[in-house]
């Protein structure tokens, strides 16, 4: 979702932690729109509609130029599973409190504050917020509709909002399986035009 417009579709996701992600994107009527492959070594987005592929390093700059969203590789992997950036080595605990049956934990960082809200019943992360040094929100993320999947609580709904960029991403899962072998690879069609970034 952006000020320019929003779009929706469906996807099949294969995620192999800690290093690879394959997303098959479908548009209206199930039309195969494209394929996104992320690994620690490579970023590849294949546009099925015009037979082009964008290839680059999986760094924040490449990802930002493609999706106009400032997220690093690990942040994207964690977002698909409803995890968010854990406290870093230099972060210090700012405060702990309980509000509306949620544990609110704040950490001070070099660049501002990280806020975690944890459900008091399930101990699952309900929301996460990054604030800059002036206290303005850089990123807000929420999870909901927790489901027990093979003994692990997983969110079926994830929403990430980038207030400064006026952009948001919403992920809603219909079906999930975990801890099963997956293959995160993709071969480009022979005649695809490849653009390197």
Predicted features along the sequence, with ranges:
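Short, surface-exposed charged micro-motifs
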Residues: 12-14, 33-35, 115-117, 145
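An acidic-aromatic
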Residues: 20-74
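Gly/Pro-enriched, hydrophobic low-complexity segments
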Residues: 93-196
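Beta-strand-dominated lipid-handling architectures at cellular/organellar boundaries
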Residues: 6-12
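A short, Trp-centered hydrophobic/proline-enriched beta-strand micro-motif
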Residues: 1-3
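C-terminal low-complexity, charged extensions that often adopt amphipathic alpha-helices
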Residues: 58, 66-95
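Short, solvent-exposed loop/edge-beta patches enriched in aromatic
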Residues: 5, 16-19
């Amino acid at each position: 979702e952006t000020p320019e417009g929003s779009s929706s579709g469906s996807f099949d996701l294969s995620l192999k932690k800690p290093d690879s992600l394959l997303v098959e994107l479908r548009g209206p009527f199930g039309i195969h729109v494209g394929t996104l492959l992320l690994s620690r070594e490579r970023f590849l987005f294949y546009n099925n509609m015009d037979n082009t592929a964008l290839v680059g390093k999986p760094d924040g700059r490449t990802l930002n130029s493609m999706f106009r969203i400032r997220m690093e590789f690990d942040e994207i992997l964690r977002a698909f599973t409803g995890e968010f950036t854990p406290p870093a080595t230099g972060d210090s605990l700012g405060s702990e409190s309980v509000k509306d049956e949620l544990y609110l934990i704040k950490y001070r960082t070099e660049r501002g504050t990280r806020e975690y809200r944890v459900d008091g019943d399930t101990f699952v992360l309900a929301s996460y917020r990054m604030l800059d040094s002036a206290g303005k929100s850089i990123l807000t993320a929420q999870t909901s509709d927790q489901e027990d999947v093979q003994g692990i609580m997983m969110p079926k709904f994830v929403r990430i909002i980038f207030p400064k960029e006026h952009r948001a991403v919403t992920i809603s899962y219909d079906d999930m399986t975990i801890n099963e072998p997956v293959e995160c690879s993709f071969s480009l069609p022979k005649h695809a035009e490849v653009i390197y970034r």
